[in-house]
Amino acid sequence: MFHVNAWGLPYSVPLSGARMVFPGAALDGKSLYELFEAEKVTFSAGVPTVWLGLLNHALQNNLTFSTFRRTVIGGAACPPAMMDTLIDKFDVEVIHAWGMTEMSPLGTAGGLQTKHLDLPKDEQRKILQKQGHAIYGVDMKIVDDDGKELPWDGVAYGHLLVKGPWIIASYYKNEGGDVLQDGWFPTGDVATIDADGYMQITDRSKDVIKSGGEWIGTIDLENLAMAHPAVLQ
């Protein structure tokens, strides 16, 4: 319960009248699958590495889920290949989410709008692969290196800044001094925002690679590697 998500699902689950199941230290694929089946889990949330182990176990043993129908994936970008497997192979709805400890913790949540329901599957999937809309109470914007705000066109990418009533203004004992930039908290992420307000993380500011005069996102490289059948992790 030390993690920031202790402020999220442990409150929202009982408020909705649902039962909560904790996996404890057993986070390997086999243990998780047996827990899901024994406790008839319908919804779960976790980081991609957790789902990687669970999916590998299910695929290698030709297993299906009897009750598991929805998952929220955050903490890192969900690889497209993983999302495809969850949706197409196991009929599990995937909700992409993003947040930070400093945001208490949720910032955005993904999902399709009504106008997207008639789009081809591959176009819908591209939307679901984004981190989603800002939740109620959270404002966001992207800026260039000079602090100039960039357009929401799905093409321009820049430093992601957020603000809201529960987003921190400073760290404990003011370590690091004033962290806000004109009232906005710098997340350290590089992102794009499209015309419909869908945000997509392209990288961490410190992780972007410059090659041949072009900036390359490490997330793109990771997704390409994860999509290869010979790559486990």
Q: Residues of each region from the PLM?
A:
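Active-site glycine-centered loops adjacent to acidic/histidine catalytic or metal-binding residues
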Residues: 75, 99, 132, 189, ...
